[in-house]
Amino acid sequence: ATSAPAKHDNIXVPIAMFGGSXNYASHLYLYD
């Protein structure tokens, strides 16, 4: 996913940490 839902607006920080790639999806599942 290239765009994050409004509910995950604060994911900007984890994206910086994970790099915002495949790990982005994993983070969504872990913190959904």
Swiss-Prot record:
A single GO cellular-component term on record: mitochondrial inner membrane
Keywords, A to Z, come to:
ATP synthesis, Hydrogen ion transport, Ion transport, Membrane, Mitochondrion, Mitochondrion inner membrane, Transport
Mitochondrion recorded as keyword: yes
- Please classify the protein's predominant subcellular localization into one broad category: mitochondrion
Q: Which GO terms describe its biological process?
A: ATP biosynthetic process; proton transmembrane transport
User: Where is the protein localized?
Assistant: Mitochondrion; Mitochondrion inner membrane
**Record has Ligase as a keyword:** no
Please give the superkingdom of this protein's source: Eukaryota
UniProt lists the family membership as follows: Belongs to the ATPase delta chain family.
Assembly notes: F-type ATPases have 2 components, CF(1) - the catalytic core - and CF(0) - the membrane proton channel. CF(1) has five subunits: alpha(3), beta(3), gamma(1), delta(1), epsilon(1). CF(0) has three main subunits: a, b and c.
What does the UniProt record say this protein does? Answer: Mitochondrial membrane ATP synthase (F(1)F(0) ATP synthase or Complex V) produces ATP from ADP in the presence of a proton gradient across the membrane which is generated by electron transport complexes of the respiratory chain. F-type ATPases consist of two structural domains, F(1) - containing the extramembraneous catalytic core and F(0) - containing the membrane proton channel, linked together by a central stalk and a peripheral stalk. During catalysis, ATP synthesis in the catalytic domain of F(1) is coupled via a rotary mechanism of the central stalk subunits to proton translocation.
Task: Please state what the protein is called.
Answer: ATP synthase subunit O, mitochondrial
Q: Which organism is it from?
A: Spinacia oleracea
